Swiss-Prot record:
This protein's UniProt keywords: Metal-binding, Nickel, Oxidoreductase
Gene: mvhA
GO molecular function, one term: nickel cation binding
UniProt name for this protein: F420-non-reducing hydrogenase subunit A
Originating species: Methanothermobacter marburgensis (strain ATCC BAA-927 / DSM 2133 / JCM 14651 / NBRC 100331 / OCM 82 / Marburg) (Methanobacterium thermoautotrophicum)
E.C. numbers: 1.12.99.-
Family of the protein in this entry: Belongs to the [NiFe]/[NiFeSe] hydrogenase large subunit family.
Residues that coordinate or bind Ni(2+): C61, C64, C442, C445
Amino acid sequence: MVKLTMEPVTRIEGHAKITVHLDDAGNVEDTRLHVMEFRGFEKFLQGRPIEEAPRIVPRICGICDVQHHLAAAKAVDACFGFEPDDVLPAAYKMREIMNWGSYMHSHGLHFYFLAAPDFIAGKDRKTRNVFQIIKDAPDVALQAIELRKNALEIVRATGGRPIHPTSSTPGGISTELDDETQKDLLQKAQRNVELAEATLELAVPIFEENIDLVNSLGNIETYHTGLVKNGVWDVYDGIVRIKDKEGNLFREFKPADYADTIAEHVKPYSWLKFPYIKDLGYPDGVYRVSPLSRLNVADKMPDAAPKAQDYFKEFQDKFGYAQQTLLYHWARLIEVLACAECAADALEGDLSGEKFPDSLERQAGDGVGIVEAPRGTLTHHYTCDENGLITKANIVVATIQNNPAMEMGIQKVAQDYIKPGVEVDDKIFNLMEMVIRAYDPCLSCATHTIDSQMRLATLEVYDSEGDLVKRI
């Protein structure tokens, strides 16, 4: 038996490894994605006042911190008796603007710095990184920095600070925008519309040049899940829509009912669980949450985003109900444009209304908040007692939900490229990494130590008893 190990997986947020298990004939027997980090944030929340949750949970991550903040805020709203539409309109809109700003920042980071090197910087490992992009196309690098800077300024103004926001309160928000700040943010959002269009003009031809790879690499057929509001793409509020493998409507449910639909499978080699649709069982019920999933389940883009709607229609006309993993990148860039347009539209409006309820009253019981994080659907579920203290917390992040699909995708790559007598090199492992990168997994939810002996690629050979006999 031979086990091939890639450690760490590069250009993702966090650390993971891939192991490929070969039988005695050299055929792929199994492929695994190992995530051995553990944080246990749910336990940290127990005993804390429920209103503190939105200020605590952003520390789970420095990239999707806004979405943890907002999902927690919506769960807290529910614990105070507020439905999403009960939140004061100006506060609701401010939360949306914060979310759109975070999307532009996160998606921009992923495409330009983590994903683009695979398509722009060549096939040599030494040049396949963001530094080569900076060297070869400094204007593109500056474009990426400007887009993310503008996005973070929007988050700073609405969230109280650019990282780990604190502004959402039960039923409202604590930040205000004066006229000068709102005008400045509007200009930044409008500029990001231009930058998002420029990014699509740059990226779409590159994707089309690599269409054979797009149509073949790590593709699997799964169910897709995402929020919609009256059938329209939405990343802050709505109902959860599930479509089956053929694109037919399978189910729609309210956020509070998520536990009736989703269950979790456990495997011993990873801290990440393997969620699935309860009625279908595992692995038949594997589903994905992602930018691609959101486009797949939506009927259209918001009226405030006509340019994104044009790209969305073109995307649907070309690919229909898309299952290709590498199309995540294309979908991600359409969302950047949509968020920039939506933010600009909102910032042109009146945001001066009341943002904090006149009275608050805690209610013992459960509160569930669901938003769409950049990587997919994010759920925060809290139970609190009559004193308003959290007794139980459950956080279901997008990367956990995509975990089964990521592993299935790298299994397919391994089976397609690793054959008896074929030398396994870093190019094959990079193809597996490309599949994982497409999902933009966020594993960096913990501050952890990296082994100083960690290598970019390791070949481990085991004997028939499973004992390690050689490491190269």
